Amino acid sequence: MESTILKWVNIAQEDLHCFENPQQTFEIVKGMIPYLHIEEIDDKAVVAYAIYPDFRGRKALSEVFMYAKPEYRSGLIFRDIVRRMETAAEKNACKIINISSNIGYKDDRILRLLSLMGYKTDTVSKEL
């Protein structure tokens, strides 16, 4: 799993320059391994998510990282990523799915697609 994490952190960093310190990001993510699930989609894309109980006693699936290589970015690959998370959530009796990483979500097309799939796209966050 560690080699998969490192591979995709490096690919995303090369494309998007999205991590202040990729090695530090890798070390943080390694600490999440007991809860982390990673699914690669034919070396085109990846999604990483954690499954854990929330404070209300319900299981939640929270997306930690998703990335698609530029040549494969489309609504179809994104829909596949989301469906994979939904399938995992159902198999693990999760009651909620949170999609919260901020790479690419400023794209209105992605937000519209999420909305069509039943997701709320209005979140409250503050970057510090």
State the predicted function of each range.
Residues 1-23:
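Short amphipathic alpha-helix that is part of the acyltransferase structural core
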Residues 15-37, 46-57:
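A conserved beta-strand-loop-helix scaffold within acyl/acetyltransferase catalytic domains
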Residues 42-47, 61:
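Glycine-rich phosphate/pyrophosphate-binding loop shared by adenosine-nucleotide-utilizing enzymes
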Residues 53-63, 120-121:
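A conserved beta-turn-beta hairpin within the catalytic core of GNAT-like acetyltransferases
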Residues 64-75:
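A short, internal acetyl-CoA/4′-phosphopantetheine-binding micro-motif in the GNAT/acyltransferase core
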Residues 77-96:
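Conserved acyl-CoA
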Residues 97-109:
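Conserved beta-strand-loop-alpha-helix junction that forms the acyl-donor binding cleft
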Residues 100, 120-128:
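Conserved catalytic-core motifs of GNAT/GCN5-like acyltransferases
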